[in-house]
Structure formats: structure tokens, C-alpha cells
Amino acid sequence: MLKQLKSMIDSGKLTVRIVRNKMVIELPEAVLFASGSAKLKTEGIRVLAELGPVLASLKGREFQVGGHTDNKPIHTKRFPSNWELSGARAIDVGELLIEYGVPGNRISAAAYADTQPTESNETKEGRAKNRRIEIALQPNLDELPDLSSFEDAE
């Protein structure tokens, strides 16, 4: 999979990290959205058009699309807070991944607003890095040990 993503990684359109034992594909706001918007840019659509089939090829794997913002408040009619903005962005990305071949029953969306910064929000650069979409490859629960044999301790 990393080989398939290499050109997008090399061009700065996405990064891949391991977070809490999960592979996370990170897409910066600058590639996907205009500031304060959940409408995907043309470049973002192109990146997702390339990424969707790669994710779809991972048979049986599930993905969580997480929307993240910086700590600067937003107060618009459509987005009363960063929670709504981050959720709308995650949903828009998830819906487009479905259009590009990822089965809808393998995608979930989550809004994180400004609760999981990767950089300090004290600088413009840090805030820019915190405005992102993360696509986390969920662990395959069928590969986890069977815990049904354990009885509740009472």
C-alpha cells in the first residue's frame, strides 16, 4: 500500500504515520479545503480519486475519517463551532471515498474539532498543521484474540 501512495507522499499531498498502533493517512487542509469551508478543492478531489481505489483494494479493512481543526473559533450559520466544521469535512471526505470505490459500510466519520492537535496552536504554521483530515486504518477485529472464554469476575 505504501508503494501505491509513494507519489502522493513525495509530493506532500499526504503523510502516513503510525498513531496508537494504527496506520493513519494525514491530508492537510491546504490540499483539501479552503479555510473555514467543507467544500473540497479540485486538488483535494484529485487526491481522493487516487487514494480511494487504494483503500478499496484493502479488502475487509475499515477506515475512520477524522476531521481536525485548529483552536481558532468559527461562528458561521453553517458552522457554529469547530465541531460542525470538522464533522462536515470528515463526512465530505468519507462520501467521496465511497464514490471512489470504498464500500460505505467500511467507512465512519468522526469530528475532533481542536481536541487532538499535532502541533502548537501558538503559531500560524502549527495551526495550519492542526487543520487536517486523518484516515485511520482500523484494526481488523477478527484478528484479535477471542475473549469470549473469559468470564466476568464478580
Task: Enumerate the predicted regions with their spans.
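Structural motif
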Residues: 22, 62, 130-132
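Extracellular/lumenal/periplasmic "stalk" regions immediately C-terminal to a signal peptide or transmembrane helix
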Residues: 1-19, 24
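Hydrophobic alpha-helix/coiled-coil detector that fires on Leu/Ile/Phe-packed helical surfaces
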Residues: 54-56
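Short phosphate-binding/catalytic loops that engage adenosine nucleotides
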Residues: 58-60, 102
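Short, basic/glycine-rich phosphate-binding loops at helix/coil junctions
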Residues: 25-31
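Periplasmic OmpA-like peptidoglycan-binding domain that tethers envelope proteins to the cell wall
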Residues: 32-45, 50, 68-148, 153-154
